A protein has these predicted regions:
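Bacterial Sec-dependent N-terminal signal peptides
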Residues: 1-24
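Flexible, low-complexity junctional segments that flank or bridge functional domains
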Residues: 17-206, 212-220, 234, 276
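Alpha-helix termination/capping residues and helix-transition junctions
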Residues: 11, 166-168, 229
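Flexible loop residues that form catalytic
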Residues: 9, 177, 243
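C-terminal "post-core" interaction segments
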Residues: 18-39, 74, 141, 180-333
Length: 333
């Protein structure tokens, strides 16, 4: 059986590119090139049309009159950024020499549900560090692991050490709030510690043509158990809206594992494998090209719901308590 998309080295980076027709290096030429790149290669048109009425042809008609040969580069960049914001996709960017166009509404329009100051209270100063993981035992004998970015590498030895250290705990909390993604291999590697058998965790498709719905058949994503130490006790994964991309995939995997509960806010999503291209002016463009789904073949582009939706309350915050962590601790009693 295949490992989970072993050919993806990094979800959230420029991981492939496409060849494009030749357009002139003018505001009009760059606009036409940009619109065409997305028209032929972006993967969520039909899904987002159903979700909120996205019409890419209407987007063309809306923005085309705004481009003229008298525009400055800054003006061209601004209009292009506004056009791409219609896609509501955190994996969509334009990289110029002076700015990066991005859409962060997937977390900026929602409560943060995370606090660095509260995290310092829970972690203290005597926590341990194993590569990208910070961990300790809380005073009620619950193991606590903080993983802030899947860009931070972890090795099998690191995971063995952490799980061995926390082996006598009654349960385990994995806090990935504010983790906006990184290396998908790290997400798979960590999730593999929480299943004793190979399991189906989702599906992926690939673009096969230039039509909006030209895709391959769905291919299975399967998670194999680690050959190292595996955790057999209850696990709670903490999430908020800033959980995105590879971190969103990790939540998808963990929802398929036994004894796992997701607590916090809906994740930010980001379920398209990003590809890249280039405009005539030399600016790089990134976009979602390969859609990924959960094990029920449902899109996770706009996020994954937790098992328990919990938010940090003002009263708890002022009292030095993280409502989400405190709720998670009650699940082990």
């Amino acid at each position: 059986m295949k490992r989970i998309i072993i050919y993806i080295a990094m979800l959230g980076m420029l991981c492939s590119c496409v060849d494009e027709e030749q357009y002139s290096d003018s505001p009009r030429g760059n606009f036409e090139a940009l619109w065409r790149i997305f028209d032929e290669h972006y993967c969520f048109f039909s899904y987002k049309k159903a979700e909120y009425g996205l019409d890419w042809d209407a987007v063309y008609q809306k923005y085309s009159p705004q481009f003229s040969d008298k525009m400055t580069n800054a003006q061209m960049f601004e209009v292009m950024a506004n056009m791409l914001s219609e896609l509501r996709d955190g994996h969509v960017n334009i990289y110029s020499t002076f700015d990066v166009a991005r859409n962060w509404s997937w977390h900026e329009d929602y409560p943060q549900n995370y606090s660095d100051s509260l995290m310092r209270i829970y972690m203290g100063t005597d926590y341990k560090i194993a590569a990208g993981l910070e961990y300790r035992t809380l005073d009620d004998n619950i193991g606590f692991v903080r993983y802030s970015s899947f860009s931070n590498g972890i090795g099998e030895g690191n995971l063995d050490a952490v799980l061995s250290e926390l082996a006598t705990c009654n349960g385990l909390i994995i806090d990935i709030r504010n983790n906006s993604g990184g290396n998908l291999t790290n997400a798979e590697q960590l999730a593999a510690r929480f299943t004793n058998k190979e399991i189906l965790v989702g599906y992926i498709q690939h673009k096969t043509g230039r039509g909006h719905d030209d895709f391959s058949a769905m291919e299975e994503q399967r998670l194999k158990p680690s050959n190292g130490m595996r955790w057999q006790k209850p696990v709670v994964v903490l999430t908020n809206r800033t959980v995105f991309s590879a971190a969103n995939e990790f939540v998808k995997y963990m929802k398929c594992c036994p004894n796992v509960t997701i607590v916090g806010d809906k994740t930010g999503g980001g379920a398209g494998m990003p590809f890249s291209s280039e405009l005539p002016c030399g600016w790089a463009v990134r976009f979602s090209a390969c859609p990924m789904y959960d094990r029920n073949k449902q899109p996770t582009e706009f996020g994954i719901e937790p098992d328990h939706n919990v938010a940090i309350t003002t009263a708890d915050f002022l009292d030095g308590k993280d409502t989400i962590i405190e709720f998670a601790r009650t699940l082990f009693k």
